[in-house]
Regions:
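Thiol-based oxidoreductase modules, predominantly thioredoxin-like and allied folds used
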Residues: 122-139, 150-161
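Non-globular targeting/processing and membrane-anchoring segments
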Residues: 2-121, 125, 143-145, 157-242
Length: 242
């Protein structure tokens, strides 16, 4: 994206807005300020681009109706997929990597859920949210207690029916993020992340756009960036942390 030099849709050019910036910090060089204002123009363009993509996402036509009301197991017992909506019309559901074959939960998924646990009380004002994995519910409840995920709703998909339908048809233990809508009693698929590992750019791990994990977004603000070989761990105090 290059900063606009002409107005688009009534918006002032990003380069013009950046040029009007009066912010300065102690002892900064002219070289720094020139580079920072150039970056500011790109940040303005990025903000606008993100909104255009979000608007395009919101404008998606109705997705397919779910083929069946999946049977899951919640903390209080068996339940149907549709019940996860509660009194909301939109449901976000994250499928984490914690299948039966895994001895420990995925550290990256755990890092993501640590962020969700903090904001879910606000998100639930707008939509319903749940986390699923192909592990017994007792195992998920124990994981929830250990990590202090008191705000998150966990459900077990031991049969794999939901996971095969909307996450991975090959029964592989991979993460997934999907959004469903309920209108006039009908539950439809609205959105799922489709950026696969094959679509990753050289030198980068697969990632969504925008990245749903604020951990990586915050590291992008640092001089070191995300790093080439650093990943979250379950426990930084012991060696058994992967």
């Amino acid at each position: 994206m290059s900063p606009s030099t002409t107005e688009v849709g009534g918006l002032s050019p990003a380069s013009q807005l950046a040029a009007s910036n009066t912010v300065h910090f102690p002892n900064e060089s002219a070289e720094y300020r020139t580079a920072r204002n150039a970056l500011l123009a790109e940040e303005i363009e990025l903000r606008r681009y993100l909104e255009r993509v979000a608007a395009q996402r919101r404008a998606l036509p109705p997705g397919g109706e779910i083929p069946r009301d999946f049977e899951l197991v919640g903390e209080a017992g068996p339940l149907r997929f549709s019940s996860l909506f509660g009194d909301k019309n939109t449901l976000m559901i994250y499928s984490m990597m914690y299948g039966q074959a895994r001895k420990t939960p995925c550290p990256s998924c755990t890092s993501f859920l640590e962020a969700w646990n903090g904001i879910v009380v606000n998100l639930r004002e707008r939509c319903a949210i749940a986390v699923t994995a192909r592990s017994p519910i007792d195992r998920l409840i124990e994981y929830k207690k250990q990590r202090g995920f008191n705000n998150l709703l966990f459900v077990s998909d031991m049969s794999g029916d939901y996971t095969r339908t909307y996450v991975n048809p090959k029964d592989e233990d991979v993460p997934g993020f999907s959004v469903f809508s309920r209108r006039d009693g009908t539950v439809r698929h609205f959105y799922s992340g489709e950026l696969s590992g094959a679509m990753a750019d050289p030198g980068q791990d697969p990632r969504g756009a925008p990245d749903l994990n604020p951990l990586w977004t915050m590291l992008d603000f640092t001089p070191e960036g995300r790093g080439a070989d650093w990943y979250p761990k379950l426990d930084y105090k012991t060696q058994n942390s992967k």
